[in-house]
Regions:
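Macromolecular interaction modules
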Residues: 1-104
């Protein structure tokens, strides 16, 4: 199992519409990816590790798939449409990482 993490840096003055992300963008991504997206989670940044520190990321999602190949096969054909929707909820450039889920 792999996890695709898409993280949005918590830059001062940035725009991020959490409601749109939760209610429209992620369900659209799931619909386009079909069964290749086993599940996903959405996180809203609250704080950093030190008291009073801001969260490094304002929001993020984690998309769970069987393999890198299954993610790429499902996401690739829809990448343009999915990425075009980003402007509807943020002006931030997402940071993406694909990880192997070791325990979970």
């Amino acid at each position: 199992m792999i996890k695709v993490s898409v993280m949005y840096p918590n830059n001062a003055g940035a725009r991020f519409d959490h409601d749109y992300y939760r209610d429209k963008h992620m369900p659209m991504l799931k619909q386009k990816m079909g069964d290749a997206c086993k599940s996903y989670t959405i996180d809203k940044g609250l704080a950093g590790g030190a008291p009073g520190a801001p969260a490094p990321y304002i929001g993020m999602c984690h998309i769970f798939c069987d393999s890198v190949e299954s993610f790429q096969a499902a996401f690739g054909p829809h990448a343009k449409a999915i990425m075009a929707d980003v402007a509807n909820y943020t002006d931030l450039k997402p940071v993406m990482q694909i990880s192997e889920v070791v325990v979970g």
